Amino acid sequence: MEDFVRQCFNPMIVELAEKAMKEYGEDLKIETNKFAAICTHLEVCFMYSDFHFINEQGESIVVELDDPNALLKHRFEIIEGRDRTMAWTVVNSICNTTGAEKPKFLPDLYDYKENRFIEIGVTRREVHIYYLEKANKIKSENTHIHIFSFTGEEMATKADYTLDEESRARIKTRLFTIRQEMANRGLWDSFVSPKEAKKQLKKDLKSQGQCAGLPTKVSRRTSPALRILEPMWMDSNRTATLRASFLKCPKK
């Protein structure tokens, strides 16, 4: 699974996922399914934000990378992917600037057009079940919830899907592609089922000649892309980085 993740996701996303797991003391060599899930969630959050701007009239518009109007205000502020301290700093800044109610839990995005925080969910289960779990945890009408599945289903608060149909279709297509690529490599069943995941982990460790009881060292290097990304996020001038082409999964 780890090899699949490194092949199929943008290196910037992989770096952010590694950083997030290390922050919580999790070993991506062992919890490979979580590694894949975090990368998938990060990519969906980036795709949700991609190309969406607000013009001078306060209207939401979709702008391609090479469009001369690319300096317009970004519609979404990306919170997911930052370390917790920085993320809360951004949330507090947004609340102080917009008057939005501070959420109890860290959200994934802030929508400057609708003036609301957004919680993005990506599930391998039924969308309505995951939606209810999110809603019961957040318990706030001020945080908008939008759930996507790997089968093309989605569910959002009050059936308000925020994005246009084409933008949502891009996300659904990407998720379906990830599912197909996992299935082609025999990884999908273990990704969905914890029981199958344990079997896959034992198989991977055996093939690598590792012992599950031994700690595995994780690289602590920080790539140039990650060093550039964080200050760009703080300045809300991240177009070039976030618009980088996502890597396609090479065929086995």
From Swiss-Prot:
Plays a major role in the shutoff of the host protein expression by cleaving mRNAs probably via an endonuclease activity. This host shutoff allows the virus to escape from the host antiviral response. Hijacks host RNA splicing machinery to selectively target host RNAs containing introns for destruction. This may explain the preferential degradation of RNAs that have undergone co- or post-transcriptional processing. Its main location: host cell. This is Protein PA-X. GO terms for biological process: viral RNA genome replication; viral translational frameshifting. The keyword NAD does not apply. GO terms for molecular function: RNA binding. InterPro entries: PA/PA-X, PA/PA-X_sf. Belongs to the influenza viruses PA-X family. The record marks K195, K198, K199 as: Important for efficient shutoff activity and nuclear localization. The active site is at E80, D108. The probable endonuclease active site in the N-terminus and the basic amino acid cluster in the C-terminus are important for the shutoff activity. The C-terminus acts as a nuclear localization signal. The C-terminus is recruited to host protein complexes involved in nuclear Pol II RNA processing. The gene is PA. The record marks L28, L65, K202, K203, K206 as: Important for efficient shutoff activity. The keyword Iron-sulfur does not apply. It is found in: Host cytoplasm; Host nucleus. Keywords: Decay of host mRNAs by virus, Eukaryotic host gene expression shutoff by virus, Host cytoplasm, Host gene expression shutoff by virus, Host mRNA suppression by virus, Host nucleus, Host-virus interaction. Transmembrane segments: none annotated.
